[in-house]
Curated annotation (Swiss-Prot):
Family: Belongs to the NDK family.
Cofactor requirement: Mg(2+)
Highest taxon in the source lineage: Bacteria
GO MF annotation, one: ATP binding
Species: Desulforapulum autotrophicum (strain ATCC 43914 / DSM 3382 / VKM B-1955 / HRM2) (Desulfobacterium autotrophicum)
Name of the featured protein: Nucleoside diphosphate kinase
Annotated active site: 115 (pros-phosphohistidine intermediate)
Designated gene of the protein: ndk
Protein location: Cytoplasm
């Protein structure tokens, strides 16, 4: 059984897409093992995206991720990282397949509604960043 982290970004929360995103996960048989809404501080956003610290979009990304509440979830299931990434679609919504979350709801490459872990190692770090073991119901 694999786990991954999913975030509904501030634009997705603002557009009232929480239910739609959760429904898409559930329609694919993905178990939601943990879920919470929170408001990231600048320090939390910088820590979470530290891997991008030297990238030109880092400041813009952390400002955006602190611009409103987010929903963080632990998703669980067989091959859930790949399933989640397929449901999300390409980072650039213009390149995402029809019917994916980003193609259906994103407005630009940064405001692309959702974030998802890209590998088991990343998922382990990201899940631990937001959740402790007591908060995850597997």
């Amino acid at each position: 059984m694999e786990r991954t982290l999913s975030i509904i970004k501030p634009d997705g929360v603002k557009k009232n897409l929480i239910g739609e995103v959760v429904k898409r996960f559930q329609d694919q048989g993905i178990h939601i093992a943990a879920l919470k809404m929170m408001q990231l501080t600048q320090k939390q956003a910088q820590g979470f995206y530290a891997v991008h610290r030297e990238r030109p979009f880092f400041n813009s990304l952390t400002e955006f991720m602190t611009s409103g509440p987010i929903v963080v979830m632990v998703l669980e299931g067989d091959d859930v990282i790949a399933k989640n990434r397929k449901l999300m679609g390409a980072t650039n919504f213009k390149e995402a397949e029809e019917g994916t979350i980003r193609r259906d709801f994103a407005t630009d490459i940064e405001k692309n509604v959702v974030h998802g872990s890209d590998a088991p190692e990343t998922a382990a770090f990201e899940i631990g960043y937001f959740f402790n073991d007591m908060e995850i119901v597997g």
